[in-house]
């Protein structure tokens, strides 16, 4: 290369600053247990370990380096929680298999646990509970969080007319029992919300949550998860969706969200496991998206680059037409390798505020 050209290339390289890179702090999976997200049936301790060992032991050799630092048990039915229902599948509003033993299985290895309230199937139940007694629902959710020492996730997927007044009452009642904790030391204080992959789905919820609950100056919720779309959605499409949250969507009234207040998400399985689960990691969506996740710059909210991390839908058996992440379809070669590659901290540290 001619000397003049080499100096030009060097000058350009120096003039273009490297993108700031922030390691992920959240790396987890929603969990649907053995019975398609009802958590009604309690497994024996040995079966539960066989099914989930990959999550707490990425090398599958009993060295117990977890593949995740967060697991979210999905789902609690909102009306049953409001009424503290006890029936064949629930005890005081909580599914039977979301018990102290299941929580301890993960927490004893440094993995944070949360319970998710709602999900798409229970959208109408969210509507009913928020119209009936959102304050009691929020208080009961906080008491469950304290009882099991877990966080709570809000998964309310009313895309047309969400009851934001009721949801505000739910959150206020929760926070009256358990205040926001920036240190993360109190697991029960962790309160998060699910939003659409981008701002074009659940737009009203995104607009209200971003302005009222997810600011860096006066946070009420810890962060938001951008939910999955379809298993075969391209990484570039998902990055475009996530950018809608970060950049804001003015025509829909959605303000910018700090990257530090957002996780992205991928599928683990479709009709069969995919590379995010079984590997090879180099062929996975999470590998392709890692640079964006760790370097995306704030655009109107927050001061640090990089999203908070990644979530995956879903461990366990999410439905009758999809694979489960139980043997032989366990995910240590996908998520486990990624946890090492991304240097995921276990236990999860205090989350960056900006």
At which residue positions do the language-model features occur?
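Bacterial N-terminal signal peptides that target proteins for export
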Residues: 1-7
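Bacterial N-terminal signal peptides
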Residues: 7-17
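Conserved short secondary-structure transition element at the edge of the structured enzyme core
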Residues: 293-298
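C-terminal cell-surface addressing/anchoring modules of secreted/extracellular proteins
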Residues: 353-354
